[in-house]
Amino acid sequence: MADDATTARDYRETVFLPDTPFPMRAGLPKKEPEILEGWAALSEKGLYGAVRQKRQAAGAPLFVFHDGPPYANGAIHIGHALNKILKDFVVRSRFALGYDVDYVPGWDCHGLPIEWKIEEQFRAKGRRKDEVPAEEFRRECRAYAGGWIEAQKTEFQRLGVLGDWWNRYATMDFTSEAKIVEEFHKFLATGQLYRGSKPVMWSPVERTALADAEIEYHDHVSPTIWVKFPVVQGSDAAVGAKLVIWTTTPWTIPANRAVSYNPDIPYSVFEVTALEEGLEFEPWAKPGDRLIIADKLAEDVFKAAKVASWKTVEAVDCEGMVLAHPLADLDSHYGYAVPMLAGDHVTDDAGTGFVHTAPGHGADDYQVWLAHGHREIPDTVDPDGAYYPHVALFAGLKVLETEGKKVGKFGPANGAVMEKLIEAGNLLARGRVEHSYPHSWRSKAPVIFRNTPQWFIRMDHAVDSLDGKTLREVAVQAIADTAFYPDGGRNRIGAMVETRPDWLISRQRNWGTPLAMFVDKHTGHPLNDPEVNARILAAIREGGADAWFTRPDADFLGAHDPAQYEKITDILDVWFDSGCTHAFTIEGRADSAWPADLYLEGSDQHRGWFQSSLLEGCGTRGRAPYKAVVTHGFTMDENGEKMSKSRGNTIEPQTITKESGAEILRLWTAMVDYQEDQRIGKTILATTTDAYRKLRNTMRYLLGALAGFDEEERVTDYDQFPALEKYILHRLWELDGQVREAYQSYRFSDVIRPLIEFCQGDLSALYFDVRRDSLYCDRPDALKRRAYRTALDYVFDRLTIWLAPLASFTMEEAWTTRFPEAGPVAYRVMPERVDAWRNDAEAARWAKVEKVTSVVTGALEVERREKRIGSALEAAPVVHFADEDLLAAFEGLDAGEVFRTSSATLVAGDAGAFRVDEVKGVSVDPNKAEGKKCARSWRILPEVGTDPRYPELSLRDADAVAYWDAGRG
């Protein structure tokens, strides 16, 4: 008879081993384009169109998601990627929740950045902008924007972003421009539009007015001066003294027309008695000088002026006081009287307690000037940021440089004004101060307040079509009626709207939508003739905004005399453009609806698109064009620093997609708290990639473990499920509620993070590990194995649909690997939550079981470290329970299976050698397993060899092999 060693059977063929074509290595950069190609082939509008068709056929409720338009200029950056991926999460999750989602991507096309680019292109060809016909210039702008729309669209689609790309909108489309003008005409018709000469934020570099939304603040170092105004009328103590003002804009002194004071602030005449000694320069203050300053600020002023001591002469009342301009002695141009004006904007927190008032260069200055009955606003600075020729002493000097290497820097005006003040004997002191200063958000150059005629929309004008309410009142109520995510957004935009000035909507540029209207040359009133407006709109629909600039006025005016009217050639604020997108994208379309269910953009859009859309909607329709607003933060580098090419800390989405795949970028977006600023970099992406691998491995295991699963194998009676399966089903029930609620509230990290934890904890560390032996070695018809595979089927089913909106490429790959004929995973709707799966008792039980398991695992680790055992299957621990509640948790369980050992014994008492401080009432004796090693399952049991048919196997394995042999025979 042959030796047993030569005849021992190889049982590997009788063991089930997970098998799947789903690869461990994702190869995302190669795989994703293949998936995109498959999606594109599903319908004329790709996967997006195919899903909409299915939802509409099923009568699904409509969800309208309106896209905030990115600017059509340049390749997308990481901020664009974050924004569009978040939007894709919304689209796909709403599809998964059973909605028919309307999402039309769009682009903002007008404005200065493109205009600058085209100017550069013409300069490179030796042509100045003023030498290029406006029609040709605008045509080049349109072509430039169109090219970037196509480029960005391709990049967004590569990220897996779904939408109606085939009907994308653009603010430069002829129909869009016509609709924008139509919306503008509504403000004209309701009396909300007016022309005003007032100081506005002006960018000399860009040569145009800017709205609040186009301003950003940066730290800036400015000169600061204390200036003396001689008192020519007032009390005896005041006349002959000099009143002191403080300003950080010396260049505005030639525009001074008044000084403001606050009647509630005490002021006095102070006399200089001594100067500081040992100075390297001679102070401009002199002993005997009498100066008028707010009492609270006198010490600060004298310190700046290097005055060592002073005395109070007497208190003064500023009402009725008249001053001379500090430059009056140098030129008669400044020989006018300078009145004192009471104003509550004046404080004694800093400065001198007085405010130098130049009504053409400040909002408060302008308001207080008008409030006191003055109407004439002086023009001091021209559109290029230089003094007009009529400004004595300073004609032609630049306030701000607009050309050459110093573009965006303050020019010689400040220095020249200070020198003349010294010459006049009216500069008391000067210094420098770092403060927050307004800059253009496009050019990044400082801006100035400048008086100029502009067109405005009134915020506080009662409008009949708004039930007699003002635009501000309607907008404030609309904010209260809107849902904000996070909720703090309501207060942020609310504070802005409550205090904002009238909406400045005119710009003095070429590339944009025109304020297409005529103004009566005699009355200054805009022409509001419906027939004229209809002709204007028809022309723009046919030929775009160019028609307004190229066609004769008579084409529009009809019976009106062209000689009587001025055609307005200003263009609209680009924020007005984008604020109208709801009117030509969602309103009036058969497969959409107004208002939108959702707007989603960066938090800076509280003062941008959210606000312009709000004001446009409220001004024309009496409500916001959205029901809810979601905001996200900004992308920073790994150290929390702002990204910039000069710092070399940028990371491009194209690079991530090429090297790692768009899925990694999508997963990073899902995992961050997007409502705050997010950090991204190589180290962070490496962590994201690691999380992705674990997620992919979970899906791969599920696919392999479910190989061959069919409905005959399914366990349909919940009561037949073992305790562990009931716990896993409970976790699915629990996660179902969390996932739905998180998606409904746009909290995507609250979807991905619990699911990753579920995969790594409940599944990989517990469920897969505990049931591995059953999956591999139980006979196929064994109830426990069938229950396991049934539960895995439910897990796979839920994970794929829950994760599909986020990890879209991988869930598509996993789903179609298992069900190649079922269509894309995006076709699916989340199955209803199965309340029968809720089992709080099993959840409580397995929390206790896991505590006990941690003690057993700790004991076995010691045994491995001491090399007394190799694997856990070599152990048969005895677990002692002083805590009866913990012992009761194991009722009906196979403790050896739970501990991943060959067997285990549970006893009441407290005699075990190994303990863990964190788990009271449990101790373990990590005994070695006794018996023989099963040649199939490798468990060491006394029963191995007791079945004569299979002497190398345990009884369970012998039965399984017999079943297998019978099936093969």
UniProtKB/Swiss-Prot annotation:
It catalyses: tRNA(Ile) + L-isoleucine + ATP = L-isoleucyl-tRNA(Ile) + AMP + diphosphate. L-isoleucyl-5'-AMP binds at residue 601. Disulfide bonds: none annotated. ATP binds at residue 645. PROSITE patterns: AA_TRNA_LIGASE_I. The keyword Chaperone does not apply. It is found in: Cytoplasm. Signal peptide: none annotated. InterPro entries: aa-tRNA-synth_I_CS, aa-tRNA-synth_Ia, Anticodon_Ile_BEm, Ile-tRNA-ligase, Ile-tRNA-ligase_type1, Ile-tRNA_ligase, M/V/L/I-tRNA-synth_anticd-bd, Rossmann-like_a/b/a_fold. Keywords: Aminoacyl-tRNA synthetase, ATP-binding, Cytoplasm, Ligase, Nucleotide-binding, Protein biosynthesis. A motif ('HIGH' region) lies at residues 70-80. GO terms for molecular function: aminoacyl-tRNA deacylase activity; ATP binding; isoleucine-tRNA ligase activity; tRNA binding. One of its GO terms (biological process) is isoleucyl-tRNA aminoacylation. GO terms for cellular component: cytosol. A motif ('KMSKS' region) lies at residues 642-646. Its EC number is 6.1.1.5. It is an enzyme of class 6 (ligase). PANTHER family: ISOLEUCINE--TRNA LIGASE, MITOCHONDRIAL (PTHR42765:SF1), SOLEUCYL-TRNA SYNTHETASE (PTHR42765). IleRS has two distinct active sites: one for aminoacylation and one for editing. The misactivated valine is translocated from the active site to the editing site, which sterically excludes the correctly activated isoleucine. The single editing site contains two valyl binding pockets, one specific for each substrate (Val-AMP or Val-tRNA(Ile)). Belongs to the class-I aminoacyl-tRNA synthetase family. IleS type 1 subfamily. Monomer. HAMAP family: Ile_tRNA_synth_type1 (MF_02002). Catalyzes the attachment of isoleucine to tRNA(Ile). As IleRS can inadvertently accommodate and process structurally similar amino acids such as valine, to avoid such errors it has two additional distinct tRNA(Ile)-dependent editing activities. One activity is designated as 'pretransfer' editing and involves the hydrolysis of activated Val-AMP. The other activity is designated 'posttransfer' editing and involves deacylation of mischarged Val-tRNA(Ile). This is Isoleucine--tRNA ligase. It comes from Caulobacter vibrioides (strain ATCC 19089 / CIP 103742 / CB 15).
